[in-house]
């Protein structure tokens, strides 16, 4: 499945209130159609310039080049529009970061409150009026743990999918204009808050540990990753089937989160399929160890690496 279709399918299956927080991939793709097409032999239409130098030599300050407001001297005319294109991408980064940081802070607070509730239940041991009262309190905690775990996994996949979309649209930009924007902008993205998922990963594992400790026989969400792996090996792209038992246990609101989580994880599995040609900027290369560590300056792509592959590297090949 092509990336655009995969991305659109995920947006349709995710939580409605999250949809406008994702990359505006389709509008950006349409915008590129207005850019002059670059020919390796003749350069862009009506151009006498054939300079192959990147516009941004300083990869640590991409936004500065977007603020000069005009044509960069000695650079291909197709790059007149690069400043406006980068401004749009920077606005998208700001949107990702704001949403991600707000959600992460919310998770920290909610998980701490749940841990305090668990401690309160332990302290009240033997003080409940009935066994049913104890069971009801524990089920409420369990439901809230399942809910927050699902939202955390959704946020991790939010990070991955938006990164994949940025890499894809930057590749299209470079191919269309003959520019060299993809590498410096991608290196900038690697250090953005929305792509720094180590703290979130720790929260996910802490939540899973509580689920497995308190409810070892009923940790549906903890086991969802293996279930999604099985789904991703097939070519079915319908919504995952949810058992009647799971539905009645989670409730309608939590079930929506659960289903969206499975859909997001299935989309990521599809995007992580390795391409036949190694590319240090490919989605699968950068995210293959996401569960263990975030990409850092030490293991990020070296600026000397070049992308010679014409094969799509942000999605499954066909």
UniProtKB/Swiss-Prot annotation:
Cellular component, GO annotation: cytosol; nucleus
InterPro entries: SPX_dom, SPX_prot
Spans annotated as Disordered: 226-247, 284-318
GO biological process, one term: cellular response to phosphate starvation
Protein name: SPX domain-containing protein 4
Organism superkingdom: Eukaryota
Domain SPX: 1-187
Database matches in Pfam families: SPX (PF03105)
Basic and acidic residues bias spans: 305-318
Composition skew (Low complexity), residue ranges: 226-237
